[in-house]
Amino acid sequence: MEITASLVKELRERTGAGMMECKKALVENAGDIDAAAEWLRKSGLAKADKKADRVAAEGRIATAQAGGKAVLVEVNSETDFVAKDENFLAFTEVVANAALNSDAADAEALKSVKLDSGETIEERRAAVIAKVGENLQVRRLVRIDSANNVAAYVHGGRIGVLVELKGGDIELARGIAMHIAAMNPPHVKASDVPAEFVAKEKEIELAKMSEKDKAKPAEILEKIISGKISKIVNEVTLYGQPYVLNTDQTVEQAVKAAGAEVIGFQRLAVGEGIEKVVEDYAAEVMKQAGLA
């Protein structure tokens, strides 16, 4: 069968693969466009396997929401350049929407979720890898599903937050989500802070004190330490931090003024916890030349 330009174009539109790859696929499969599409998918999977050991620490946070049900997903690429590629961006939206419409509890479960096209997320990932030429990973998925106010906020594609707020309104929930994106509090309130953390901070503060302060009466010493610990706890709790949208009050004051309560939140930032590999090519060349 003759491999026409229109046939190559049709396969390219269907798969998104490059023109030469589409032509090769059609030649390999005697012009059968369905077989060629499958061949490209398998080729994509092979390429994905070859790139699997490459560090993917860039990427994007995407969200999808329907009422009180919302998700955040982190999809990683190797470079910031690919993180801005239209194929990559489209894939992150596909992943977020698939997560929202499934009951997948985590990124691993999300891999096997089927799309309307019949592909799984994992198969689509492999196809996008074939297009962009980098290792891509669907790394994390978090969700909130509640009858309370739920706000989803993504800042610059790099940081995403979900907030569940009992009472108040969605505007307040969104404001709190923006605060969490900016300030990254580890905990909601003081009672959530682990006792081990507080005990360790007390040790540190005591060690930092001068001998003169340590010689003060026990009750005065306790007040000094308690004041320092209270300040530290405020710094690591959402409720204790000055509200970024109105620094004249804390988040707790803003929430209580609305008769509300923060039930919980989720925050994701691109690449957090991933050790990036920094290549020193000059040192590598010198090493190979026996000069280092």
UniProtKB/Swiss-Prot annotation:
Compartments (UniProt record): Cytoplasm
UniProt similarity note: Belongs to the EF-Ts family.
Designated name of the protein: Elongation factor Ts
Organism expressing this protein natively: Xanthomonas axonopodis pv. citri (strain 306)
Function of the molecule: Associates with the EF-Tu.GDP complex and induces the exchange of GDP to GTP. It remains bound to the aminoacyl-tRNA.EF-Tu.GTP complex up to the GTP hydrolysis stage on the ribosome.
Cellular component terms (Gene Ontology): cytoplasm
Alphabetical list of CDD domains matching this protein: UBA_EF-Ts
Pfam families in alphabetical order: EF_TS
Major localisation: cytoplasm
InterPro entries membership: EF-Ts_dimer_sf (IPR036402), Transl_elong_EFTs/EF1B (IPR001816), Transl_elong_EFTs/EF1B_dimer (IPR014039), Transl_elong_Ts_CS (IPR018101), UBA-like_sf (IPR009060)
Annotated spans, Involved in Mg(2+) ion dislocation from EF-Tu: 79-82
Sorted UniProt keywords: Cytoplasm, Elongation factor, Protein biosynthesis
GO molecular function: translation elongation factor activity
